[in-house]
Swiss-Prot record:
GO function terms (MF aspect): structural constituent of ribosome
Alphabetical keyword list: Cytoplasm, Ribonucleoprotein, Ribosomal protein
Family the UniProt entry places it in: Belongs to the eukaryotic ribosomal protein eS1 family.
Annotated source species: Catharanthus roseus (Madagascar periwinkle)
Name of the molecule in the record: Small ribosomal subunit protein eS1
Protein's GO biological process: translation
Subcellular location: Cytoplasm
Quaternary structure (record): Component of the small ribosomal subunit. Mature ribosomes consist of a small (40S) and a large (60S) subunit. The 40S subunit contains about 33 different proteins and 1 molecule of RNA (18S). The 60S subunit contains about 49 different proteins and 3 molecules of RNA (25S, 5.8S and 5S).
Extent of Basic residues compositional bias: 1-18
Domain of life: Eukaryota
Segments of this protein annotated with the region Disordered: 1-20
Length: 261
């Protein structure tokens, strides 16, 4: 009787099954440091592939943009509708030093502001700060009923909308051109520009919910480490590392004279 091949018995593959490589084994965690204008400085961590040969880890992190809620940066839930963009500018040790790179509204907040029986007024303008950052600022505002108004609607006329838009641009330019980026961000957080626009346009038509809803950075100046360290004002040496004393073995011993040589 011929002995046939048992097809059910499968041969084992040579070398066995390959072990899946852990994708995190070749990566490092870095701390993201926010500028000093925000209350919370250590805002999170980011991953980057470890330095291998000519591929340097810090180059992979350079100019990486992080989007963080202003509520997390300020520790206040009232600011949760605003998103802040921070760009990695420099890497020191395991810390990524960032700078402001724009902001925006959350979609749900923007949709909640738009209602019936009122006029929506928008304006945008390109401005240059004193430290040579070129920004595009977008402003939004809504008309509201005058005091003791019985009429259901509060629509502004086209001529009034043009006047309000002109006033919005004028205030945005004046506020941005008179300060640097750090001071301008400090104006964005408490909505001081929106309140100024509200006050200035009250004689034309009363407004409500006036916000700088979006800021885009169109052009940034050449990188300057000194300026970045000013933005991270209270960034101390403890974050970078501690200074170590030189070991005694490394100290050069003084030659001793041998008597009788």
């Amino acid at each position: 009787m011929a002995v046939g091949k048992n097809k059910r018995i499968s041969k084992g593959k040579k070398g066995g099954k390959k072990k899946a490589a852990d994708p995190f084994a070749k990566k490092d965690w870095y701390d993201i440091k926010a500028p000093s204008v925000f209350s919370v400085r250590n805002v999170g961590k980011t991953l980057v592939t470890r330095t291998q040969g000519t591929k340097i880890a810090s180059e992979g992190l350079e100019h990486r943009v992080f989007e963080i809620s202003l509520a997390d940066l300020q520790g206040d839930e009232d600011h949760s509708f605003r998103k802040i963009r921070l760009r990695a500018e420099d890497i020191q040790g395991k810390n990524v030093l960032t700078n402001f790179w724009g902001m925006d509204f959350t979609t749900d907040k923007l949709r909640s502001l738009v209602r019936k029986w009122q006029s929506l007024i928008e304006a945008h303008v390109d401005v240059k700060t004193t430290d040579s950052y070129t920004l595009r600022m977008f402003c939004i505002g809504f008309t509201k009923k005058r005091a003791n108004q019985q009429k259901r609607t509060c629509y502004a006329q086209s001529s009034q909308i043009r006047q309000i838009r002109r006033k919005m641009r004028e205030i945005m330019v004046n506020q941005a051109q008179s300060c640097d980026l750090k001071d301008l961000v400090q104006k964005f957080i408490p909505e001081s520009i929106g309140r100024e626009i509200e006050k200035a346009t009250s004689s034309i038509y009363p407004l409500q919910n006036v916000f700088i809803r979006k800021v885009k950075i169109l052009k940034a100046p050449k990188f300057d480490l000194g300026k970045l360290m000013e933005v991270h004002g209270d960034y101390n040496e403890d974050d970078i590392g501690t200074k170590l004393d030189r070991p005694a073995e490394e100290a050069v011993a003084e030659p001793t004279e041998v008597i009788g040589a």
